[in-house]
Curated annotation (Swiss-Prot):
Protein name, entry field: Large ribosomal subunit protein bL33
GO process annotations (BP): translation
Single GO MF annotation: structural constituent of ribosome
GO cellular component: cytoplasm; large ribosomal subunit
Alphabetized UniProt keyword annotations: Ribonucleoprotein, Ribosomal protein
InterPro entries: Ribosomal_bL33, Ribosomal_bL33_sf, Ribosomal_zn-bd
Cysteine disulfide links: none
UniProt family annotation: Belongs to the bacterial ribosomal protein bL33 family.
Native organism taxonomy: Bacteria, Pseudomonadati, Pseudomonadota, Alphaproteobacteria, Rickettsiales
Length: 56
């Protein structure tokens, strides 16, 4: 069987300050900078920027 990759789970936290977050897998070898996505925040009811934070 193949080994599992070195993917990390990271938390994408809303920049709106609502506390809403998404969890995403990320390969540390391919990406050096932090992830940021524009996704829907249902608490704010609009699309906002989500930035990467460590998942505990």
């Amino acid at each position: 069987m193949a080994k599992k990759g070195a993917t990390l789970l990271v938390k994408l936290v809303s920049s709106e300050g609502t506390g809403y977050f998404y969890v995403k897998k990320r390969d540390p070898k391919k990406l050096v900078q932090k992830l940021s996505f524009r996704k829907y925040d249902p608490v704010a009811r609009k699309h906002v920027l989500f930035k990467e934070e460590k998942l505990r």
